[in-house]
């Protein structure tokens, strides 16, 4: 994996990265490069980047995939590097998580592409750090640093859980979410449209024995709605362990923890077996950029995980060029709905001739 522009900016300044270092949500394999010169740990919330570091040989005893950092993994870091997340709430969460892990006088490094909103993050750094300032900038990226000069509050994971009641498609659900999870704290418009359309669909009458996959589960709203509607056990998949934790919390809040199987996966890599139904409001961004490769890879692989005559339901912004990709993957598709800027597509695993 080539280093992206943000990591290249860190390379320009790595003479300052010495001692014991933690990377929070690295976006490429730069932690491995730096580990040849320093004592480096990496905390990932994305299965994709976790797998990338494993593949290149990063020490697995210093590499962690989790929604929160456990103290037994390490503390007293000299430097902690955070890659600017798209969601500002997730940056707040990461800062609250890692500040207690930083030794007094230690340094936080925040690096991000200008499009990520990093320019507006200085105030967030100043809330817990001193001597905050711009260290460097290049290739439309910025690097800020700040020092820990004051005591910090212990991190309490439960303080970051958002819980609310949501009415959707004939059901009242208790939903839980965490910073950075898709649709955090609210009902996504596309999901609302999808569930209302599925509520009218013939297959929803009797599928308690069906295998159903929710791809890109977010806070678990689709998975929970499907379980309540059908009685089926749902497999919920996401690349983000924050999303998987939110889904776990959502099912627990509705007293149906045993009704879901959670899978952390880059695309469908970790999926075994076949499903009668796959339902998805798929991601179409890599960072801040539209990225068709995520959906294209998913559509091309999903046919390997559909039963004979198995069905796929997709909701998407109607400007996304999904129809030709669906046709290439499944041979054909049907558009079930188009309005309000969204479309719902239906595909089926072709019967063998």
Curated annotation (Swiss-Prot):
The name this protein goes by in its record: Ribosomal RNA small subunit methyltransferase C
EC number(s) reported in the record: 2.1.1.172
Protein task: Specifically methylates the guanine in position 1207 of 16S rRNA in the 30S particle.
UniProt catalytic activity: guanosine(1207) in 16S rRNA + S-adenosyl-L-methionine = N(2)-methylguanosine(1207) in 16S rRNA + S-adenosyl-L-homocysteine + H(+)
Principal subcellular localization: cytoplasm
Keywords noted in UniProt: Cytoplasm, Methyltransferase, rRNA processing, S-adenosyl-L-methionine, Transferase
Family: Belongs to the methyltransferase superfamily. RsmC family.
Summary of subunit composition and partner proteins: Monomer.
Pfam family, one: MTS
Top EC class for this record: transferase
GO molecular function: 16S rRNA (guanine(1207)-N(2))-methyltransferase activity; nucleic acid binding
Species the sequence originates in: Marinomonas sp. (strain MWYL1)
CDD domains: AdoMet_MTases
Transmembrane spans: none
A GO term from the CC aspect: cytoplasm
Organism placement in taxonomy: Bacteria, Pseudomonadati, Pseudomonadota, Gammaproteobacteria, Oceanospirillales
Originating gene: rsmC
Subcellular location field: Cytoplasm
């Amino acid at each position: 994996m080539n280093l992206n522009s943000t990591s290249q900016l860190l390379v320009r300044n790595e003479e300052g990265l010495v001692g014991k270092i933690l990377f929070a949500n690295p976006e490429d394999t730069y932690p491995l490069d730096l580990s040849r010169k320093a004592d480096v740990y990496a905390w990932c919330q994305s299965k994709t980047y976790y797998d990338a570091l494993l593949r290149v040989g990063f020490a697995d005893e210093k590499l962690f995939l989790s929604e929160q950092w456990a103290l037994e993994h390490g503390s007293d870091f000299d430097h902690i590097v955070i890659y600017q997340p798209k969601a500002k709430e997730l940056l707040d969460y990461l800062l609250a998580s890692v500040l207690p892990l930083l030794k007094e006088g230690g340094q936080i490094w925040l690096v991000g592409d200008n499009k990520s909103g990093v320019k507006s993050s200085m105030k967030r750094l100043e809330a817990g750090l001193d001597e905050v300032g711009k260290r460097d900038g290049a290739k439309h990226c910025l690097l800020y640093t700040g020092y820990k000069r004051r005591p910090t509050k212990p991190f309490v994971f439960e303080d970051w859980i958002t819980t609310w009641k949501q009415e959707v498609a004939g059901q009242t659900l208790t939903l839980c979410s965490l910073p950075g999870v898709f649709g955090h704290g609210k009902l996504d418009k596309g999901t609302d449209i999808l569930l209302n359309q599925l509520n009218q669909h013939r297959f929803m009458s009797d599928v308690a024995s069906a295998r159903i996959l929710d791809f890109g589960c977010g806070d678990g709203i689709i998975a929970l709605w499907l379980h309540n509607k059908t009685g089926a056990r749902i497999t919920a998949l996401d690349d983000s362990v924050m999303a998987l934790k939110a889904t776990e919390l959502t099912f627990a809040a509705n007293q149906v923890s045993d009704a879901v199987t959670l899978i952390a996966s880059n695309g469908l890599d970790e999926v075994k077996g076949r499903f009668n139904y796959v339902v998805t409001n798929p991601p179409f961004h890599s960072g801040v950029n539209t990225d068709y490769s995520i959906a294209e890879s998913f559509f091309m692989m999903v046919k390997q995980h559909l039963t004979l005559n198995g069905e796929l339901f997709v909701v998407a912004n109607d400007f996304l060029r999904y129809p030709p990709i669906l046709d290439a993957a499944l041979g054909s598709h049907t558009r079930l709905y188009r309005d309000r800027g969204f479309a719902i597509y239906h595909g089926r695993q072709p019967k063998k001739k």
